[in-house]
Regions:
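Boundary at the C-terminal end of the N-terminal hydrophobic targeting segment
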Residues: 29-36
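Solvent-exposed helix/loop surface patches that form functional interfaces
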Residues: 39-41, 106-213, 218-220
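N-terminal mature ectodomain segment of secretory-pathway/periplasmic proteins
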Residues: 40-44, 48-122
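Ligand-binding grooves and catalytic loops that recognize ribose/phosphate and carbohydrate rings
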Residues: 223
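Bacterial N-terminal signal peptides
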Residues: 16-27
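Short acidic/polar alpha-helix capping motifs at helix-coil junctions
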Residues: 23, 55-58, 157-158
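Bacterial N-terminal signal peptides that target proteins for export
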Residues: 3-17
């Protein structure tokens, strides 16, 4: 039983990690804020599946405020672990971007009986992240896992806004054979996340494998 619970805890950590990274799916035109683009979509929703079962949704809201891009994320999911325990996951986060860098963010995550709040803000050439455990300080341009602008993923490290930790990444892109668009893989230290985009860089799908639980998949809801 101890070994089973150890696997369970590890799987839950990866599941929550993947969920918290899913930060937006927005279609842009060729002029405006952030990487020279404007927002076309104001609200985008993803259905979330674990295996073949729908376990919840993740909704994203986008707003241009002057030179800033404001992104709000809300997730609500319930999934079962080893057929005997339901886990409730609730998440809300707010990010503010400018000039391809994160200006500030705040996040609140409830998973089961635990709750975590984190916030961060740019101060000149420093980005300070704080939570109940203290502060972390980073230098230079900080970026989170901005799936909605794939060029922003091309960095050596990306910020996990759930816990305020910079994660080493390597991104590989490849064309989709026999269909339009392209795919991208975010290689993490112990796992990977596969993404699908349309030709206009519109993010439409996410997939990753969770040990013992199966495939986690985000699928964009077409309205």
């Amino acid at each position: 039983m101890k070994q089973r619970m150890s696997y369970c805890n590890g799987t839950l950590k990866k599941l929550i990690f993947v969920l918290i990274l899913a930060y937006g799916a927005v279609n842009f035109s060729q002029a405006g804020v952030l990487a020279g683009r404007n927002i076309d979509d104001k609200l985008i929703k993803f259905d979330v599946f674990l295996g073949s079962k729908k376990v919840g949704f993740h909704t994203f809201y986008f707003e241009k405020v002057g030179k800033e891009l404001h992104v709000k994320s809300e997730a609500n999911m319930t999934f079962r672990v080893f057929l005997f325990k339901n886990i409730k996951y609730l998440h809300e986060a707010n990010e503010v971007w400018q000039d391809n860098c994160l200006l500030k963010f705040s996040s609140k995550t409830i998973k089961g009986d635990s709750e975590l709040s984190v916030e961060g803000k740019n101060f000149g050439d420093k980005f300070i992240v704080s939570n109940l455990s203290g502060e972390n300080q980073f230098s230079g341009c900080v970026r989170s896992f901005a799936y909605w602008a794939p060029e922003l993923l091309e960095a050596e490290e990306l910020l996990n806004v759930e816990n305020g930790v910079l994660v080493p990444v390597k991104v590989d892109k490849q064309p989709n054979h026999n269909e339009s668009g392209y795919s991208a893989t975010i290689n993490l230290p112990k796992s990977k996340i596969d993404l699908k985009y349309q030709d206009d860089d519109n993010w439409i799908e996410l997939e990753t494998n969770l040990k013992l639980l199966g495939k986690l998949r985000y699928k964009k809801v077409v309205t």
